[in-house]
Amino acid sequence: LSNYEIRSRYPNFYMSLYDELLRIPFLITGPGITSKKITRPIRTIDIFPTLFDILKLSFPSKIQGKSFFNLFTQDDKNPDPCFIHTIPYEKPSKYDRVGIRTPNFKYFRNAKNKNEDVHLYDLINDPLENKNIANYENTKVMQMEDILSSITSFTTNIEKENIDEEEEQKIRDELKKLGYL
């Protein structure tokens, strides 16, 4: 088996940030929408503004994200990096990872410790993400960490509300029904 095939057999693989787990198909069709395959990653934060753009509605400025509707007619030479994060855990986990993906590189690391489990992949020369070059490309790792830090600086730490056990169980049951737990 190749490295690519071997890692898919790891017990915690579903908690990774490799492209085979991140890439999902997304289809938009309708009047005035040109048929085109967009191969670069699209940020989920940009879907809502794109739908507003397609419907010719004004987009509230306080909401983050940018329309990618123009990608149907032209190429984006400078796309924003995509923030990537493993599935959030109910309790802190050593497997939690955060990172960013650009057209040329992917960088991710432990969510709590920026020096732990650091990965950097050159997606042009290694599209299957087999060779982690983080130990050889310190400057690039620092650049990617700076980008990641600027993205995560906008997030806030939300304190868990104090809810009783009965309410917490109801929430758990609903999440189970929806397939999240």
Where in the sequence are the language-model features?
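Catalytic domains that recognize anionic headgroups
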Residues: 1-181
